Amino acid sequence: IDTAAVYGNEQGVGAALKESDIVREDIFVTSKLWNTERGYDATKAAFAQTIATLGVDYLDLYLIHWPANTKQFEAKDAELNAETWRAMEDLYNEGKIRAIGVSNFMPHHLDALMKTAVIKPMVDQIEVHPGWPQAEAVRYNQAHDILVEAWAPLGEASALSNETIATIATKHGKTAAQVC
C-alpha cells in the first residue's frame, strides 16, 4: 500500500486497516516524507504523525518524496537531504522502519546523499515505464545495489495498446500491463 502525507490517503488507509481483518505483517505499507518536513527533527515528527495517522507501529518502507533542491532551499539542499537521511537512518536503526529509501532521486542526488549516509538508500522510487525507461538512473541504482521501484509503471494509458508492448506480452503469455 503506497501512501504519502501529501496524497492525503494515510487517514483513509489507516481506517481501512483498522476495520479489516488483515494481519499487519501480511501487508507492505510505504509512506513518504513531504518536502516541507526537512531536517532531522522535522523528519522524526513527520514520521511519528504518519504512523499515528496510519495506526501502525512501523512502516515497511519510508521514502524521502523528492530531493531537496537549491531553488526551494537555497544553498542548503544537500545539507537538508543529509540531515533528513540521518533521521531516517535512526528510525531504521530503532526498528520503526523496515527499509528506507528515496523517491525521484537521480544519480547526482544519490551521489551527494551517499557522501554522508551511513546506510545507503535501499530503494529509489522513480518514474519508469516503457515510454520513459530512465536507463541511466536504473543502471546507477543497479550498480549501487539500490532497488528501483517504478511509479507510473504503465506510463500513459496508450502503453496498454502499444503494438510493440502487445507483441512482447503475447510472446510471453502476459498482458500489456504485466509487461509494463
PLM region descriptions:
Residues 33-41, 71-77:
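Active-site mouth loops of central-metabolism enzymes
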Residues 67-180:
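Beta/alpha (TIM)-barrel catalytic core signal, keyed to glycine-rich beta->alpha loops juxtaposed to Asp/Glu
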Residues 2-27:
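N-terminal binding-site loop/beta-alpha segment at the start of enzyme catalytic domains
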Residues 1, 59, 100:
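Glycine-centered flexible beta-alpha turn that most often forms the glycine-rich phosphate-binding loop
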Residues 43-64, 90-94:
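CE4/NodB-like, metal-dependent polysaccharide N-deacetylase domain
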Residues 24-37, 58-67, 125-128:
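A short, structured active-site edge motif that brings together acidic residues
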Residues 10-17, 44-51, 85-89, 107-111, ...:
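Generic structural signal for well-ordered alpha-helices
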